[in-house]
């Protein structure tokens, strides 16, 4: 492949990631952070089993939920989203060690850290070459013998509400609907007593009742039609609002065994692997 062609492909991939990853996470950061508060067990165990005094990095740390798991180790967190880094600062006013940094261009020294974690991040790079390069870059920061724990969304999510499964497209745009801060007006129930079931003709002279009933029926039909039109307009407005509040994030859904292949291609040695929370994970050691 020519250098120019490779540069063009990288440029296209970067544009896609900017549009469907970086911009989106900055837009949804506060809402996203509210849904990311419970640490996953295997990540927690990985961190708790590190020797006291170990130093590591969390690449794509989000709101920093893993940074305080083990008080006896030191972790520097980074994320491409300045919005999520702000959330990390807000969640820990005393201050996490976090910074805004691209996962492909980490400012840390090479061969320095005892371990790394990157949870649900690598799948956002939009080509295999870039995903392998991202893993390689993470490993470059870890000393020889150090380990990195990497999680990526799985293609095989048969028991998940998302319903992804083997045979489906692996490169997908996943919707995220922002919460509308404005309270939606509640629609009136159709049967709320607004319309009379029968006209009151007690005070109407007998000879005028037929005309009175006919007029009453017309008025009721007009009111009913007006309410139906109003409900439809309200429904269309809500759909437009939801469409405006829906943001799409790019994901590569990893099939079983694929993450291990990428870690090996990145120069690592697979120590163990598994499945948790609709994600494949790999612990990869730097030779």
What are these regions (language model features)?
Residues 53, 113-114:
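Local beta-strand N-terminus motif with an aromatic residue
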Residues 117:
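A conserved beta-strand element that flanks and buttresses the S-adenosyl-L-methionine
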Residues 2-108, 129, 136, 144-287:
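Class I (Rossmann-like) S-adenosyl-L-methionine-dependent methyltransferase catalytic domain
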Residues 120-124:
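Short catalytic micro-motifs in class I SAM-dependent methyltransferases
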């Amino acid at each position: 492949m020519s250098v120019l062609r490779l540069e063009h492909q990288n440029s296209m991939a970067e544009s896609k990631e900017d549009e469907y990853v970086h911009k989106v996470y900055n837009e949804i950061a506060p809402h996203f952070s509210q849904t990311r508060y419970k640490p996953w067990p295997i990540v927690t165990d990985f961190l708790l089993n590190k020797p006291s005094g170990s130093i590591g990095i969390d690449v794509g740390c989000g709101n920093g939920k893993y940074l305080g798991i083990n008080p006896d180790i030191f972790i520097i967190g980074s994320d491409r989203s300045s919005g999520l880094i702000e959330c990390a600062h807000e969640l820990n006013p005393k201050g996490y060690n976090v910074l805004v940094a691209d996962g492909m261009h980490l400012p840390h020294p090479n061969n320095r850290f005892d371990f790394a974690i990157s949870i649900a991040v690598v799948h956002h790079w939009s080509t295999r070459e870039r995903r392998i390069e991202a893993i390689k870059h993470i490993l470059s920061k870890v000393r020889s013998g150090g380990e990195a724990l990497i999680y990526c969304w799985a293609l095989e999510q048969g028991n998940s509400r998302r319903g992804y499964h083997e045979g489906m497209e692996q490169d997908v745009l996943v919707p995220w609907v922002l919460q509308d801060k404005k309270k939606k007006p509640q629609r009136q129930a159709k049967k709320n007593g607004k319309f009379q079931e029968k006209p009151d003709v007690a005070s109407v002279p007998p000879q005028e009742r037929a005309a009175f009933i006919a007029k009453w029926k017309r008025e009721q039909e007009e009111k009913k039609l007006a309410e139906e039109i109003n409900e439809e307009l309200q429904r269309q407005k809500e759909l437009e609002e939801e469409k405006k509040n829906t943001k799409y994030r790019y994901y590569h859904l990893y099939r079983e065994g694929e993450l291990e292949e990428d870690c090996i291609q990145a120069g690592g040695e697979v120590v163990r692997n598994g499945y948790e929370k609709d994600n494949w994970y790999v612990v990869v050691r730097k030779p």
